[in-house]
């Protein structure tokens, strides 16, 4: 069965680059009826954070990326790793190295003085003597010293490494017995049945070491896909200064998971000229073999555009649920659906939508001085006062309100522009809002009259 995985280290919160990798792995597995598993690579016990693990799972839940089975923790699998280290030792494919840190530092200094690449010199590779007393050895794999390691990457094509240029007998277990990253990854990927490994191309240099271990252990090699990094707008590696990188920050900033996933899937992959991809679209069209070889560029303007699209088009019930996170339950209002629908057309984020909603739900405490100076004078104040007095205290539809208002203005030889902005200022405190008639239907005539009275009192 086609099986992919996402295997983060819990040393920090999940960033957007990691989420993109997880999304690609998820899509490929789900499209092909395969399995997608989550593995936490927490062998670095000093740097692990339980908060980071919680944040990763929270981000997956928010984005709707479900994984199969239980989460696998490497820290609970040390006994398994030790079995395979013993197997390699017993078969003569790995060995104990008693070289001290002082000796290793001296070797590196001598190599650097000769302008040679620092590497282990293999002095214990074929050692048969008596081990030095009082030294806990590391375990090293017997790596090929010559020749090449080649594989076909699903994105980059044919990849070749010269063993003499990049390899030495690298460590697979430290002196305290803990296994190293590359060793754990190979054991886990093999035992978990991972058939396709999709990961960032910062892992490309690990691949020859992992291939050596796969072959030494007799495991089948998965297909590798090394995805190019995401760059900031200035061409440098994406970092905090280019915008938020922690996935859950995007939720707090008012971005929808549908928009974020759509944004991320397009950072390195495309299908024709299409920009909008629902999850069903992604599952239909995505293929990791189509991922671009070159780095992609993070563009917040594009994310804003996508987010605005989803705010406009998602069903009311869906958006109302999302808005609860921001403290507004639109279902609690008689005209909640009308209110949300009147605001969604002009909102790029849910934070903007929240602020706009609060400007309508709550009576204004202050008024935009520039708007007041521009749109309200003695004549408009009288018109507002007369308009409020002319309204009956009963709730009416936006269409009826518009008809009543137009009739009121025509009797006085006035136009809608003569009163629209003063009404808007009375309702929201500013000259910006959706249709005033939709807003009046939401708040009701009684509240409208109260807000007009409050504005006039403030201006007197």
Swiss-Prot record:
Family stated for the protein in its record: Belongs to the class-I aminoacyl-tRNA synthetase family. Glutamate--tRNA ligase type 1 subfamily.
Subunit structure: Monomer.
Gene3D superfamilies (UniProt xref): 1.10.10.350, HUPs (3.40.50.620)
Transferase listed as a keyword: no
First-listed, main subcellular location of the protein, grouped into a coarse class: cytoplasm
Binding site for ATP: 240
Biological function: Catalyzes the attachment of glutamate to tRNA(Glu) in a two-step reaction: glutamate is first activated by ATP to form Glu-AMP and then transferred to the acceptor end of tRNA(Glu).
Intrachain S-S bonds: none
Alphabetized UniProt keyword annotations: Aminoacyl-tRNA synthetase, ATP-binding, Cytoplasm, Ligase, Nucleotide-binding, Protein biosynthesis
One GO term of the biological process aspect: glutamyl-tRNA aminoacylation
UniProt source species: Campylobacter fetus subsp. fetus (strain 82-40)
InterPro entries named in the record: aa-tRNA-synth_I_cd-bd, aa-tRNA-synth_I_codon-bd_sub2, aa-tRNA-synth_I_CS, aa_tRNA-synth_I_cd-bd_sf, Glu-tRNA-ligase_bac/mito, Glu/Gln-tRNA-synth, Glu/Gln-tRNA-synth_Ib_cat-dom, GluQ/Sye
Protein name per its UniProtKB record: Glutamate--tRNA ligase 2
Gene Ontology MF: a single term: glutamate-tRNA ligase activity
One Pfam family named in its UniProt record: Anticodon_2
CDD domains tied to this protein: GluRS_core
UniProt-annotated location(s): Cytoplasm
Motif placement: 'KMSKS' region: 237-241
A GO-annotated cellular component: cytosol
PROSITE patterns: AA_TRNA_LIGASE_I (PS00178)
């Amino acid at each position: 069965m086609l099986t992919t995985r996402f295997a983060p280290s819990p040393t920090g919160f999940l960033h957007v680059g990691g989420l993109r990798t997880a999304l690609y792995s998820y899509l490929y597995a789900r499209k092909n009826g395969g399995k997608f598993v989550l593995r936490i690579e927490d062998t670095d016990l000093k740097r692990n954070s339980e908060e980071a693990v919680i944040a990763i799972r929270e981000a997956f839940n928010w984005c709707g990326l479900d994984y199969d089975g239980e989460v696998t923790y490497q820290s609970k699998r040390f006994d398994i790793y030790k079995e395979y280290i013993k197997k390699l030792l017993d078969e003569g494919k790995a060995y104990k190295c008693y070289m001290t840190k002082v000796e290793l530092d001296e070797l590196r200094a001598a190599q650097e003085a000769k302008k040679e690449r620092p590497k282990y010199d293999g002095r214990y590779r074929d050692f048969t003597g008596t081990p030095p007393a009082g030294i806990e050895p590391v375990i090293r794999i017997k790596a090929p010293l010559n020749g090449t390691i080649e594989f076909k990457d699903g994105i980059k094509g044919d990849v070749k490494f010269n063993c003499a240029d990049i390899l030495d007998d690298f460590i697979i277990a430290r002196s305290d017995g803990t296994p190293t990253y590359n060793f754990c990854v190979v054991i886990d990927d093999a035992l978990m049945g991972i058939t396709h490994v999709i990961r960032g191309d910062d892992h490309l240099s690990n691949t020859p070491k992992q291939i050596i271990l796969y072959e030494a252990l007799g495991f089948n090699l998965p297909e590798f896909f090394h995805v190019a990094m995401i760059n900031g707008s200035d061409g440098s590696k994406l970092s905090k200064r280019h915008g938020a990188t922690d996935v859950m920050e995007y939720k707090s900033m008012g971005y929808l998971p549908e928009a974020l996933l759509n944004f991320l899937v397009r950072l390195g992959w495309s299908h024709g000229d299409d920009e909008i991809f629902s999850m069903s679209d992604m599952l239909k069209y995505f293929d990791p073999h189509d991922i671009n070889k070159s780095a992609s560029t993070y563009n917040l303007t594009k994310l804003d555009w996508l987010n605005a699209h989803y705010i406009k088009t998602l069903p009311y019930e869906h958006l109302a649920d999302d808005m609860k996170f921001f403290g507004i339950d639109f279902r609690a209002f008689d005209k909640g659906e009308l209110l949300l629908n009147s605001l969604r057309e002009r909102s790029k984020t849910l934070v903007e939508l929240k602020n706009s909603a609060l400007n309508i739900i709550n009576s204004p405490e202050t008024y935009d001085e520039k708007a007041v100076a521009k749109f309200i004078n003695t004549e408009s104040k009288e018109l507002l006062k007369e308009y409020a007095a002319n309204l009956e205290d009963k709730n009416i539809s936006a269409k009826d309100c518009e008809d009543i208002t137009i009739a009121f203005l025509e009797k006085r030889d006035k136009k809608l522009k003569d009163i629209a902005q003063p009404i808007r200022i009375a309702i929201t405190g500013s000259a910006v809002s959706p249709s005033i008639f939709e807003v009046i239907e939401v708040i009701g005539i009684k509240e409208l009259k109260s807000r007009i009275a409050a504005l006039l009192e403030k201006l007197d």
